[in-house]
Amino acid sequence: MSSKGQMLQDPFLNILRKEHVPVSIYLVNGIKLQGQVESFDQYVVLLKNTVTQMVYKHAISTVVPARPVNIPHEHPAQKQEQAQDA
């Protein structure tokens, strides 16, 4: 997975995890899963409902939070400027 993909996925999933936001996860085969993001890594998301399911990211089509979330993100140029200022 590209680092740009991780720059988007990780903050998004982390906010969902930290704030215990209920989510609907749609798989590429059309199945809808619901629960809360318990944990995640490069390849999987642990989704907790009555049980914890390990869902492979390559099988996920869409992640839909039950409420709006603010995702803090920086552009690479901003990161470089901050590093140079330090």
Curated annotation (Swiss-Prot):
This protein's source sits in the domain of life called Bacteria
Q: Which GO terms describe its biological process?
A: regulation of DNA-templated transcription; regulation of RNA stability; regulation of translation, ncRNA-mediated
Record-level GO cellular component terms: cytosol
Residues covered by region (Disordered): 67-86
Q: Which GO terms describe its molecular function?
A: RNA binding
The answer, when asked if Signal is one of the entry's keywords, is: no
Q: Which residues form the Sm domain?
A: 10-69
* PROSITE patterns assigned to the protein according to its UniProt record, in alphabetical order: SM
Keyword flag RNA-binding: yes
Positions in coiled-coil regions: none
> Which InterPro entries does this entry report, sorted A to Z?
Hfq, LSM_dom_sf, Sm
Q: Enumerate the UniProt keywords alphabetically.
A: RNA-binding, Stress response
Q: How does it assemble?
A: Homohexamer.
Function of this protein? Answer: RNA chaperone that binds small regulatory RNA (sRNAs) and mRNAs to facilitate mRNA translational regulation in response to envelope stress, environmental stress and changes in metabolite concentrations. Also binds with high specificity to tRNAs.
Protein family per UniProt:
Belongs to the Hfq family.
* Protein name (record): RNA-binding protein Hfq
